């Protein structure tokens, strides 16, 4: 009987799985001066658009943002050398801080993009940190897009 318990105790961890993404199926809100750091994938299948704090993407392996709804962040930051793959777009309503790594959008899907809302701005763009793919801006006449390819910043002026 003791041997059976030992065997079960050894096999139990094989059936346990860790959560590999933050899955939003309700309402998440970042309150004024609040901060959330994503170190894993984000699957956003519900409203995530009434935010006033900072949403940061951190880590040392690529993070994916996907889901049925586009998240809208107030302040956004990327500090992930491997980048953030956007499988659904994201919007920034205030500051985007490029520290390290690229926001990457699929080249074959123009409807997935990094969106700067009216009066949004960015800092820190560089060869290793920018948007590698599609970017949009809302209600602005003049804007310099922080875009480029996988190796080099190639800003585009509107």
Predicted regions and their residues:
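Extracellular beta-sheet-rich ligand-binding/adhesion modules
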Residues: 17-158
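Bacterial Sec-dependent N-terminal signal peptides
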Residues: 1-25
């Amino acid at each position: 009987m003791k041997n059976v318990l030992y065997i079960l105790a050894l096999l139990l961890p094989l059936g346990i799985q860790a959560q590999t993404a933050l899955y939003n199926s309700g309402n998440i809100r970042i309150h004024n001066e609040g901060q959330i750091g994503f170190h894993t994938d984000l699957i956003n299948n519900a409203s995530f658009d009434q935010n006033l704090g900072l949403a940061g993407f951190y880590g040392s392996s690529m993070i994916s943002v996907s889901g049925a709804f586009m998240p809208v962040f107030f302040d956004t930051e990327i500090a992930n050398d491997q980048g953030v793959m956007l499988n659904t777009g994201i919007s920034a309503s205030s500051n985007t801080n490029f520290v390290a790594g690229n926001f990457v959008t699929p080249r074959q899907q123009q409807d997935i993009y990094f969106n700067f809302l009216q009066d949004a701005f960015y800092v820190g763009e560089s060869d290793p940190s920018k948007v590698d793919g599609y970017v949009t801006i809302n209600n602005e006449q003049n804007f310099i897009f922080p875009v480029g390819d996988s190796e080099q910043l190639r800003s585009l002026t509107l």
